[in-house]
Amino acid sequence: MADAGLDPAPPVLGEDATAVACLFRGLADPTRLMIVRHLARGEHRVVDLVAHLGLAQSTVSGHLACMRDCGLVTSRAQGRASVYSLARPELLDLLLAAQAYLDAVGERR
């Protein structure tokens, strides 16, 4: 029996659960969150992200591939380089909501 005072489950938890899980998998790594932070400032080549993050090119490329597969970033060719950008600006709203949630519950890990 459903509680009369509770709102029904948001539709995001229904048929789109797989897509939502993929979205959060794409964000579930501190390095990927740092990549989002850099891409929020504008497009970056892989070599630029490597320099900013201090990681191997293969590591950064692997994270970008995961993020691309999850629909978080897009890429375009620029000569022999790939230039990455955030797929949608709403991603930043999601991260702000996550920060607000963490602030509300006082969780820091």
Predicted regions, residues:
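Residues within the DNA-recognition helix of helix-turn-helix
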Residues: 63
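N-terminal helix-turn-helix DNA-binding core of bacterial DNA-binding proteins
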Residues: 14-59, 71, 78, 82-91
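Low-complexity, flexible helical/coil segments
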Residues: 72-75, 109
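Short hinge/loop at the helix->beta-strand junction immediately C-terminal to the helix-turn-helix recognition helix
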Residues: 66, 71-72
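Amphipathic alpha-helical dimerization/coiled-coil segments
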Residues: 1-19, 88-109
